[in-house]
Amino acid sequence: MLFPSIVAALAALANPVLSLTIPQATGSELDVQLSAIGNTRIKAVITNKADRQLKLLKYNNFFDDGPIQKAGVFKDGQPVKFEGMLRRVLMKNLEPSLFVSLSPGQTVEREFDIASTADLASGGAYSVFSQGAIPFAEGDGTTIAGAVAFKSNKLDLDIDGALAATVSKAINPISARTRVESACRGEQRETLLKALEYSAQLSRAAAQAAQNNTRKVEEYFMKSDAQTVETIVARLNAVAQESSSTDSGATRYFCNDRGNQCTPNTIAYTLPSLNVVVNCPIYYDLPVISDECHAQDQATTCLHEFTHNPGVYDPYCRDHAYGYDGIRKLSPEQALLNADTYSLFANGKPKSQTTSNFNLKF
């Protein structure tokens, strides 16, 4: 993992939703129907099927105004490479403006263009599908009370590749002429180094726990067979390795926002297509490591973000769900590729704040 001295100006981005096979849609309190309204432009019709109001968090789903991936795109049964942003959201002290309320039976529509975050220039047959769990609050409050799962229909498309290639991309290529001096200095640098130290420690401990406690693996990942455990251990060990070096590795880490994506309650974000991690200002307000079960802190944020980077471990993790209640609604396939599942598993019980001496070089 590198602290670069130069970085390109980062433009608008996006956020993965799905991977692997496409399951059939089933009943849910939230109905999502996808339809095509252009070559690569999609309309999502979201209906509250519950008998109560749903007060949904806007981030990382169809209601997000940011350039995140609203649906997975597939060609020949395989996910198309995603080029966009994944953000980690602080799940407390949420502003009312970060929620959208749907009354029972209410329907809203959202539109997005899948070509802005995927290369569809080859054209031909594609499938689009979305699935996940959206956090919600209750009444007039903004405290997350749970998560509502959803599965959309599978939308088949015949895409004109030449037309798709004309859609503006959400992320611009790196320009060697656009340089920003390193901002990882002083107190921010020391804070991040300490968080990386704990990230390495937590990741290694979690990898060992996965091998020794299949009951806990089942609780968080919905499955505990040998292949599942092997994947979990390999990913966590890869995160530990990436956390243990600041002058080499697969990722670049920025202490300050360079893409103007640090919206309210965004702790950090990752650009998986570039293997870049960026901290937002509120990252530095969090404790380096927390003794509270499932709490968000700097160390688990580093762990969380590194699981998003294909250079660390591929296939990289998405943001299918947030929080313990949310991850418990995922399928085993989704859980294995969900970033918050790993960070929650790693701090699923209070941690000692003793620090081992990692050889962190800068």
Curated annotation (Swiss-Prot):
Superkingdom, natural source: Eukaryota
GO BP terms in the entry: proteolysis
Main location: secreted
Residue positions assigned to the propeptide: 20-177
Disulfide pattern: C184-C255, C262-C280
SUPFAM superfamilies associated with the record: Metalloproteases ('zincins'), catalytic domain (SSF55486)
Enzyme Commission no: 3.4.24.39
Signal peptide: 1-19
Record GO terms (molecular function): metal ion binding; metalloendopeptidase activity
Positions annotated as active site in the UniProt record: E305
Subcellular location: Secreted
Alphabetized UniProt keyword annotations: Cleavage on pair of basic residues, Disulfide bond, Hydrolase, Metal-binding, Metalloprotease, Protease, Secreted, Signal, Virulence, Zinc, Zymogen
Cofactor(s) of this protein: Zn(2+)
Binding residue positions for Zn(2+): H304, H308, D319
Reactions mediated catalytically: Preferential cleavage of bonds with hydrophobic residues in P1'. Also 3-Asn-|-Gln-4 and 8-Gly-|-Ser-9 bonds in insulin B chain
Cofactor note: Binds 1 zinc ion per subunit.
One cellular component term from this protein's GO annotations in UniProt: extracellular region
PANTHER family: NEUTRAL PROTEASE 2-RELATED, PTHR37016
Assigned protein family: Belongs to the peptidase M35 family.
Job of this protein: Secreted metalloproteinase that allows assimilation of proteinaceous substrates. Shows high activities on basic nuclear substrates such as histone and protamine. May be involved in virulence.
Protein name stated in the entry: Neutral protease 2 homolog MEP2
Organism: Coccidioides posadasii (strain C735)
Gene from which the chain derives: MEP2
